[in-house]
C-alpha cells in the first residue's frame, strides 16, 4: 500500500496543506521545530486515529481553532481508498470511501503504518508499559479481533478496578459481581495473550533473520513473553482463560486490599535476549539498537504476511541514532519495498548514496517546498 496524498486543515502547525507523495522514499528536510515530525504524526493519526506522541487530542488541533481535519488517498492492491478523520470537541469522526464509520475500530486497519523514532529504542530498554503499547499498537493494526478484545478488556479492567476499590473501602460487599467481572476479564485477557504469543512467534522468526544478517551471524536474537500464566505459549485460549480465572480467585483478597487488578495482559512484558543474555539488562547500547532495528524491520514483513499489504514506514530522525552500518542495512532493506517517510536535518553521507530517487521536501514554518530532482 502507499499514501498518494495528504490534506491537512488546522493540524498542529499546519493551517492548510495539500501534498502529493512518491510511492518510494519521501524525505522531509528541515531544522527542528519546523513541522517535519508533525507531518509524520499526521500520517500516523490518519492511520490509527490517535497520536504516538501525545494522549491529548487537543494538542493536535492548531492553536485557537476547534477542529482538525486529515484526509488522504490510500492505494491498496484492491484499489484506491479515500480516508478522512476529523478531530474536534465532540470527539472523532472517521470516513472510509466517504462513508462515516460507526466505530473507530472499523476504521483502523485501512492504512497500516510503522513508526521508528529515537524513542523507539526504548522498546528494548524502556519500561514494560512501552513494550505492551508496542504490541497493542502493532497487533491491533494486523487483527481487528485483537483490537476489539483489547478495547473490551480495558473497559472491564476499569470497571473491575473501580469495584475492587469499593470493596476495599467497604462501599460494596457483593463478591459475586466481582466474580462476574473476573470471568469477563479472563475471557478477553486469554484472547489477547494467545494472539500476542502467536504473532510474537512469527515476529521473532523475521527479527532473528534480520538480526543475524546485521551481526554477520555472530549473535542470535530471542524473544520471551513474560506472563503469570504458566506455559501459555503451549496452550489454548481456553486453558489460558481457566488459568486466569483460578489466579483471580487466588489473588482476590490481595487485589481487594490493594484496590487494583494485579495480573493479566496489562501486566505482562516482552524480553529480548542476545546469545542467551537479557539485552535490556546486559546488552551494550549497540546491541540494544540492533535489536530495536531488527524488530522494526521484522514488523514490515509480519504486517505483509498478516494483512496482505506492506505498511507505510515512518522514520523520524532515526538515522542520527544509527551508525553507518546500521543505516546501510535499514536503507537497503526498505529500498523499493515500502513507501517511506524520512525526516532529517540534512541528507548526506550514507543516506544520500543509498536512497534511490527520493522525493525531497524542504520544511520550514509549516510550509513545504519540493526540491527539484538531481
Swiss-Prot record:
The keyword DNA repair applies. SUPFAM superfamilies: P-loop containing nucleoside triphosphate hydrolases. ATP binds at residues 30-37. Pfam families: SMC_N. Its main location: cytoplasm. InterPro entries: DNA-binding_RecF (IPR001238), DNA-binding_RecF_CS (IPR018078), P-loop_NTPase (IPR027417), RecF/RecN/SMC_N (IPR003395), RecF_2 (IPR042174). GO terms for molecular function: ATP binding; single-stranded DNA binding. The RecF protein is involved in DNA metabolism; it is required for DNA replication and normal SOS inducibility. RecF binds preferentially to single-stranded, linear DNA. It also seems to bind ATP. Keywords: ATP-binding, Cytoplasm, DNA damage, DNA repair, DNA replication, DNA-binding, Nucleotide-binding, SOS response. The gene is recF. PROSITE patterns: RECF_1, RECF_2. Belongs to the RecF family. Gene3D superfamilies: P-loop containing nucleotide triphosphate hydrolases, RecF/RecN/SMC, N-terminal domain. This is DNA replication and repair protein RecF. It is found in: Cytoplasm. One of its GO terms (cellular component) is cytoplasm. GO terms for biological process: DNA replication; DNA synthesis involved in DNA repair; double-strand break repair; SOS response.
Amino acid at each position: 500500500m502507499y499514501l498518494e496524498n495528504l490534506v491537512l486543515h488546522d493540524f498542529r502547525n499546519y493551517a492548510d496543506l495539500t501534498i502529493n507523495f512518491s510511492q518510494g522514499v519521501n524525505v522531509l528536510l528541515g531544522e527542528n521545530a519546523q513541522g517535519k515530525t508533525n507531518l509524520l504524526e499526521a500520517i500516523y493519526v490518519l492511520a490509527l486515529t490517535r497520536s504516538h506522541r501525545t494522549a491529548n487530542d487537543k494538542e493536535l488541533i492548531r492553536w485557537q481553532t476547534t477542529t482538525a481535519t486529515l484526509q488522504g488517498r490510500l492505494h491498496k492492491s484492491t484499489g484506491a481508498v479515500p480516508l478522512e478523520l476529523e478531530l474536534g470537541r465532540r470527539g472523532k469522526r472517521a470516513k472510509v470511501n466517504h462513508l462515516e464509520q460507526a466505530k473507530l475500530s472499523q476504521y483502523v486497519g485501512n492504512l497500516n503504518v510503522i513508526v521508528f523514532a529515537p524513542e523507539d529504542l526504548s522498546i528494548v530498554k524502556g519500561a514494560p508499559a512501552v513494550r505492551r503499547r508496542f504490541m497493542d499498537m502493532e497487533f491491533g493494526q494486523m487483527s481487528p479481533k485483537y483490537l476489539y478484545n483489547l478495547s473490551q478488556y480495558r473497559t472491564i479492567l476499569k470497571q473491575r478496578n473501580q469495584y475492587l476499590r469499593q470493596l476495599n473501602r467497604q462501599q460494596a460487599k457483593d463478591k459475586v459481581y466481582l466474580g462476574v467481572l473476573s470471568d469477563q476479564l479472563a475471557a478477553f485477557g486469554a484472547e489477547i495473550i494467545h494472539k500476542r504469543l502467536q504473532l510474537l512467534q512469527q515476529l521473532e522468526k523475521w527479527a532473528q533473520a534480520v538480526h543475524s544478517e546485521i551481526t554477520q551471524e555472530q549473535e542470535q536474537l530471542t524473544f520471551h513473553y513474560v506472563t503469570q500464566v504458566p506455559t501459555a505459549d503451549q496452550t489454548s485460549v481456553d486453558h489460558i482463560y481457566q488459568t486466569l480465572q483460578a489466579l483471580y480467585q487466588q489473588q482476590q483478597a490481595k487485589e481487594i486490599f490493594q484496590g487494583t487488578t494485579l495480573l493479566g495482559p496489562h501486566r505482562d512484558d516482552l524480553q529480548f535476549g542476545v546469545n542467551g543474555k537479557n539485552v535490556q539488562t546486559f546488552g551494550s547500547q549497540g546491541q540494544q539498537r540492533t535489536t530495536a532495528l531488527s524488530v522494526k524491520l521484522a514488523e514490515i514483513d509480519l504486517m505483509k504476511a498478516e494483512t496482505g499489504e506492506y505498511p507505510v514506514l515512518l522514520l523520524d530522525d532515526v538515522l542520527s541514532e544509527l551508525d553507518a552500518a546500521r543505516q546501510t542495512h535499514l536503507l537497503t532493506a526498505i529500498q523499493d519495498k515500502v513507501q517511506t517517510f524520512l525526516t532529517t536535518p540534512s541528507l548526506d553521507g550514507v543516506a544520500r548514496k543509498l536512497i534511490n530517487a527520493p522525493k525531497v521536501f524542504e520544511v520550514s514554518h509549516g510550509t513545504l517546498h519540493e526540491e527539484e530532482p538531481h
